[in-house]
């Protein structure tokens, strides 16, 4: 029975899932907008939102925890120097998931994941 087992397996091993969401979180932090499948987008929330909450209080311990979860110095720098300050007054809900149709090859539902209140520039390309 699968009672109270949360999270999607996404047809991957646990190490593959962990690496995939780590990479997706770093891409989201760096680009602030990514395009992925809808189930991956919904699971990404569980990884990315706690990182932003962690970045709201800048300390050496929190930076080490964030680096342990992302393994990217540039992502940790942006988290604590930019995003932590941007969302200091927001009590969660840092991500927005927008459905954007279906993928051409396998008809998988696709979605954009973006940071709320991100500065909107000219033509911003989604990292894929």
Curated annotation (Swiss-Prot):
Record keywords, A-Z: Ribonucleoprotein, Ribosomal protein
Q: Under the GO molecular function aspect, what terms does this record hold?
A: structural constituent of ribosome
> Example GO biological process term?
translation
Coiled coil location: none
Pfam families of this UniProt entry?
Ribosomal_L17
The record's annotation in PROSITE patterns points to: RIBOSOMAL_L17
GO CC annotation: cytosolic large ribosomal subunit
* Gene3D superfamilies linked to this entry: Ribosomal protein L17
Similarity field: Belongs to the bacterial ribosomal protein bL17 family.
Indicate the quaternary assembly: Part of the 50S ribosomal subunit. Contacts protein L32.
Matching NCBIfam families, A to Z? L17 (TIGR00059)
Name of the protein in question: Large ribosomal subunit protein bL17
What species is this protein from? Pseudomonas putida (strain ATCC 47054 / DSM 6125 / CFBP 8728 / NCIMB 11950 / KT2440)
Gene for this protein? rplQ
